[in-house]
């Protein structure tokens, strides 16, 4: 189990936003690894560019061991996704992301299929991770599938281009435009991996957002579950206030230093607690001896 903290800033969705004022950047993204300890402290920063034929995606990684920030040009396309145990590619985060340039795209049409939807049971704080994560697949008693109209979009790898997936079929919700499922085919044309986006409707915002993203590897029976928050004290906070200043490479170093200070303070508190409890235990032993 890997715990992550992710921040998004999407300036193109702000009222009155105009593409010419976005500096060709539509999404700012930070992913910070909180646990386990062997991975904790690594921070990924991405500036997602609008027109990647003009300027490629920009990415940086903060390494807590080296305490330095470096460029990360490989955070794209079919390079392994961070903290995924090689079960997804970089462009599979949020179901699909990044430049479409390696594929030819075709709008096949509209059809009705069963898709993950209204996943409120999977989102419930009454449910534990162990209730959801089962061998080979998630607990289907908690998942919900509904018959919905979706747009079917096919992407086929261009001649001369390289990618782990030779073809993808995306199923895009007619109402929300959220990608709900993807079939990913290997270089031999065989179905290789299947993605699902289990969504809920935040009526108060309003928006539709995934509460769980899954990627199933049919070649080995393993799967990746991303976005679980059932046991966390806080779920998605759509009211967070950000600016581009929060998403600069220099901010990664400050964030890393802050985490190290918090970690040191946590160790000091733990040592004080251990010393206190050791004293209590000694006192009890002494009292027992007297008795």
PLM region spans:
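N-terminal leader/targeting segments and the immediate start of mature chains
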Residues: 1-30
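Short, solvent-exposed polar/charged micro-motifs at secondary-structure junctions
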Residues: 1-2, 82, 115-117
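Gly/Pro-enriched, hydrophobic low-complexity segments
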Residues: 30-39, 44-100, 136-240
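A broadly tuned "polar low-complexity/structure-edge" signature
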Residues: 41-46, 107-108, 264
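Mature hydrolase/peptidase catalytic cores and their serpin-fold inhibitory cores, especially
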Residues: 100-166, 249-261
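Secretory-pathway-linked proteins and extracytosolic
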Residues: 221-265, 284
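A cross-taxon signal for low-complexity, glycine/charged-rich
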Residues: 266, 271-275, 282-287
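Arg/Gly-rich low-complexity intrinsically disordered repeat tracts
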Residues: 290-291
């Amino acid at each position: 189990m890997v715990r992550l903290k992710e921040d998004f800033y999407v300036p193109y969705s702000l009222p009155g936003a105009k593409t010419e004022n976005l500096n060709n950047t539509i999404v700012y993204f930070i992913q910070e690894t909180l646990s386990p300890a062997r991975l904790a402290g690594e921070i990924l920063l991405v500036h997602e560019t609008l027109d990647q034929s003009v300027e490629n995606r920009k990415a940086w990684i903060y390494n807590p061991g080296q305490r330095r920030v470096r460029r990360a040009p490989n955070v794209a396309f079919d390079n392994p996704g961070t903290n995924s145990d090689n079960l997804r590619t970089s462009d599979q985060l949020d179901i699909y992301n990044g430049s479409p340039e390696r594929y030819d795209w075709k709008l096949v049409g509209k059809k009705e299929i069963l898709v993950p939807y209204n996943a409120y049971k999977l989102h419930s704080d009454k449910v534990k991770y162990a209730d959801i994560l089962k061998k080979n697949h998630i607990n289907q008693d908690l998942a919900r599938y509904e018959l919905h109209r979706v747009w079917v979009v096919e992407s086929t790898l261009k001649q001369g281009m390289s990618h782990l997936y030779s073809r993808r079929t995306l199923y895009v919700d007619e109402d929300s435009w959220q990608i709900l499922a993807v079939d990913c085919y290997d270089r031999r044309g065989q179905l290789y991996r299947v993605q699902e986006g289990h969504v809920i409707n935040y009526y108060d915002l309003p928006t539709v957002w995934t509460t769980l993203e899954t990627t199933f590897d049919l070649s080995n029976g393993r799967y990746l579950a991303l976005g679980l928050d059932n046991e966390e004290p806080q779920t998605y906070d759509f009211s967070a206030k950000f600016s581009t200043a929060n998403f600069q490479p220099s901010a990664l170093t400050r964030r890393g230093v802050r985490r190290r200070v918090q970690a040191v303070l946590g160790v000091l508190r733990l040592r004080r607690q251990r010393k206190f409890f050791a004293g209590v235990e000694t006192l009890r032993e002494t009292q027992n001896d007297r008795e």
